C-alpha cells in the first residue's frame, strides 16, 4: 500500500496542534504499527479507537432489508501508516465498517466514545472508485432523535461519484437538508474539514470552503462515526472490491 506523500500544510490544513479559536482534543496518524484484518484496534490503537458496530450489524440499508452490514473483523486493518477499509462481498453480503475515535467527553447514559457540542473535524482520506459503496463520515446526535436534532456529514457520497458535505437541519422532516458538492473524486488524497459552531456549519476541502449553512443548525451534543457502508440506493456488484484509506484524523473543541 502506498504511503501518501507529505508536504508542508497551509494553516487551514494543519492537523496537529491548536488553532486560533480551537483546542485540539484528538490526533491520530496510525504510526504505532500494523494491525491485520480481524484484529483492529489491537493493543496499539485500542486506547484511542473503537471498531464500532459488531460484525453482522445491519448498516443503514441493511436495516431496510438489503444484504449489507458492518463487519469490522473482515474489513478494518492498519498498514503502512493508514487505517484501511477492505470493502467487499462475502456470501452475498456487502461489508463495511464504522470505527469511532475515542477521547474523554461528558456523555453519560449512555456513554459515548466521543462527544462534543460544537467542534472542528479534519480527515485526510481517499478511496477506490467503488459503485454501490459509500462514505458517510458523520456527526450523529447523542439523543438519537433524528431528524429532530439534525446530522452533519462530510465526506459523504457513493465512492464512484463525488464527495459532498451535508447538513440535516433540526426539523421533523427527513428531507430538510442541504448538500455542498466538491466536484472532486474520492480517488485522490483530500483533506475534508467540518467546522461546527453555534448557528453555523462550514465545510472545507483541501483548505477551501465549499459552503456554509446557518439555518436550524444542530445545537445538541453529537458523536463522530466514520460510517462506511453500501446499498444506498443500489448494492455493489458481488465482484466489486477495493479500499478506503484514512491517513490522519484530527479533532478540536472550541477554545474557551
Feature-to-residue mapping (PLM):
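GH16 jelly-roll
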Residues: 2-256
Amino acid at each position: 500500500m502506498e504511503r501518501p506523500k507529505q508536504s508542508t500544510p497551509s494553516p487551514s490544513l494543519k492537523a496537529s496542534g491548536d488553532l486560533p479559536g480551537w483546542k485540539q482534543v484528538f490526533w491520530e496518524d496510525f504510526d504505532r504499527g500494523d494491525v491485520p484484518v480481524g484484529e483492529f484496534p489491537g493493543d496499539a490503537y485500542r486506547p484511542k479507537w473503537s471498531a464500532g458496530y459488531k460484525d453482522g450489524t445491519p448498516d443503514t440499508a441493511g436495516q431496510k432489508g438489503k444484504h449489507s452490514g458492518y463487519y469490522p473483523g473482515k474489513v478494518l486493518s492498519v498498514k503502512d501508516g493508514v487505517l484501511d477499509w477492505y470493502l467487499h462481498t462475502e456470501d452475498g453480503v456487502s461489508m463495511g465498517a464504522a470505527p469511532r475515535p475515542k477521547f474523554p467527553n461528558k456523555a453519560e447514559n449512555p456513554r459515548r466514545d466521543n462527544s462534543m457540542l460544537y467542534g472542528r473535524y479534519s480527515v485526510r482520506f481517499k478511496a477506490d472508485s467503488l459503485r454501490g459503496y459509500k462514505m458517510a463520515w458523520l456527526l450523529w446526535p447523542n439523543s438519537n432523535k433524528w431528524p429532530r436534532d439534525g446530522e452533519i456529514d462530510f465526506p459523504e457520497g457513493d465512492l464512484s461519484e463525488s464527495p459532498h458535505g451535508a447538513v440535516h437541519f433540526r426539523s421533523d422532516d427527513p428531507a430538510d437538508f442541504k448538500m455542498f458538492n466538491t466536484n472532486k473524486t474520492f480517488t485522490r488524497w483530500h483533506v475534508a474539514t467540518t467546522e461546527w459552531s453555534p448557528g453555523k456549519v462550514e465545510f472545507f476541502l483541501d483548505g477551501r470552503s465549499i459552503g456554509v449553512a446557518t439555518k436550524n443548525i444542530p445545537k445538541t451534543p453529537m458523536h463522530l462515526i466514520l460510517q462506511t457502508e453500501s446499498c444506498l440506493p443500489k448494492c455493489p456488484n458481488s465482484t466489486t472490491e477495493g479500499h478506503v484509506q484514512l491517513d490522519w484524523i484530527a479533532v478540536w473543541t472550541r477554545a474557551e
